[in-house]
Amino acid sequence: MQETGVHNGAHGADKFGLKNLKGVYWNFAAPQLYEHALKNGEAVLSADGALCADTGEFTGRSPKDKFTVRDATTETTMWWGGNQSITAEQFETLYQDFLKHAEGMTLFAQDLYGGADPSFQIKTRVFTELAWHSLFIRTLLRRPDRAALESFVPELTLIDLPSFRADPKRHGCRSENVVAIDFARKIVLIGGTQYAGEMKKSVFTTLNYYLPEKGVMPMHCSANVGPQGDTAIFFGLSGTGKTTLSADPNRTLIGDDEHGWGKDGVFNFEGGCYAKCIKLSPEAEPEIFAASSRFGAVLENVVLDEITRKPDFDDGSKTENTRSAYPLESIPNASLTGRAGQPKNVVMLAADAFGVMPPIAKLTPAQAMYHFLSGYTAKVAGTERGVTEPEPEFSTCFGSPFLPRDPSVYGNMLRELIAKHDVDCWLVNTGWTGGIYGTGHRMPIKVTRALLTAALDGSLRNVEFRTDPYFGFAVPTSLHGVPSDILDPVKTWADKAAFDATARKLVGMFQKNFAKFEAQVDADVRAAAPDVKMAAE
């Protein structure tokens, strides 16, 4: 077996059980991975130097094909209400079949860190069949220096083989596509899909399992820090604006998707960004556009002009879930340490497909826990397989697919941290205004940015607020530079009776969804629920 590249020879591929390989390319950087991806026909170049790959059949995550080993430990520590299980025996069969499938291959290996805080990071080794997948995960996680690579001993190992086809009867899974995690052995197996996001979310899921035991709250959020050292975190599902809104030229970016919150503040799990880039433009998102238009960026399912090879970010013919992966250092004001102090503001982003939520609302601590556990948003087209237009969804903790533990674990941690550090909490609607999806229009990003700026710099505290009659939270009545009508959603609807009926419908959906949490929360959190009676007064 031919092995090339810097690595710890005492802990090579054979330690993972990989045998009879043709070779392993260890810790190759972007230029080498570009060469292999292009030579192997995996990807093409854009005119700006980005590496462009298609993911084929799977253009999003497949949460129904994700499985966790149920053993004596996970039997009681896992949230089985939101996760699917396989037996240890089924996982072992799958693992051995992965190893057999890899024989004769040349694999790409990356040794990386999940987590910017050395006290809580997990040493992660990723074997990939495709060179562009190796570049993707190298871009998304954090990269050790050469000395660390020479002594690197992995704690978590991923093997990613898109050409592998699972057998549901043999492996206990649902289809030929599979993501399987064994927390006891710290192994992740990914097969049957070329969608690279499965790798990063598998590392995230692993950190979500282990970090609460260490007193760290793992979060599906972006984070940035202002000139006064004021940290803000932004919760939200894919497509709700985490990446876009945290990329603010006036604030330092900590990260766009995954963070931990512990005794020393906030830290990024990653070393790169993974931005949705449908309709990406230099006017609306200049930093993300520039980062996606250069050497080192990886574009997924983005259509290129046949002649000029310029990306057409408006073309969603392959999927609405087009993506750009790029290193954090491509953002001019990104933090290279990936760490910041205790948050002063928590922002919960919701893409309200009903168009009845205000563009911003201030939450009490009890309301913050209520809306965190509710995780209301809309599934945005293309983020998951089979979703072609927004659908209302309650995804607890704004990340249900990535929660290995019961949501109350994360909810209680959030409430304690908010109280301890006297954090201001906000709910921001980046979804629809002027009507339900299909009738109204998307909330203007300029309005969202203006309101967020005022919230984060403290000026929004000094304006007059009203109590929303449906949801009970505090809504500003005016802000300089923002049309006052847009702050009160009913004023943006032509049909006021339709607004009332739609708002009541959504209130009922909140109440129905939260019923499963009522026994696990205090009375003040239950009282923070939207109330139809309140709306009737």
From Swiss-Prot:
Disulfide linkage = none
Q: Which reaction does it catalyse?
A: oxaloacetate + ATP = phosphoenolpyruvate + ADP + CO2
**Protein residues bound to Mn(2+):** K201, H220, D257
Which keywords describe this protein according to UniProt? ATP-binding, Cytoplasm, Decarboxylase, Gluconeogenesis, Lyase, Manganese, Metal-binding, Nucleotide-binding
InterPro entries in alphabetical order: PEP_carboxykinase_ATP, PEP_carboxykinase_C, PEP_carboxykinase_N, PEPCK_ATP_CS
Q: Which residues bind ATP?
A: K201, H220, G236, L237, S238, G239, T240, G241, K242, T243, T244, E285, R323, T448
Q: Which Pfam families does the record associate with it? A: PEPCK_ATP
**Protein function:** Involved in the gluconeogenesis. Catalyzes the conversion of oxaloacetate (OAA) to phosphoenolpyruvate (PEP) through direct phosphoryl transfer between the nucleoside triphosphate and OAA.
The Swiss-Prot or TrEMBL record describes its family as follows: Belongs to the phosphoenolpyruvate carboxykinase (ATP) family.
The identity of this protein, by name, is Phosphoenolpyruvate carboxykinase (ATP)
Name its species.
Answer: Rhodopseudomonas palustris (strain HaA2)
Q: What is the lineage of its organism?
A: Bacteria, Pseudomonadati, Pseudomonadota, Alphaproteobacteria, Hyphomicrobiales
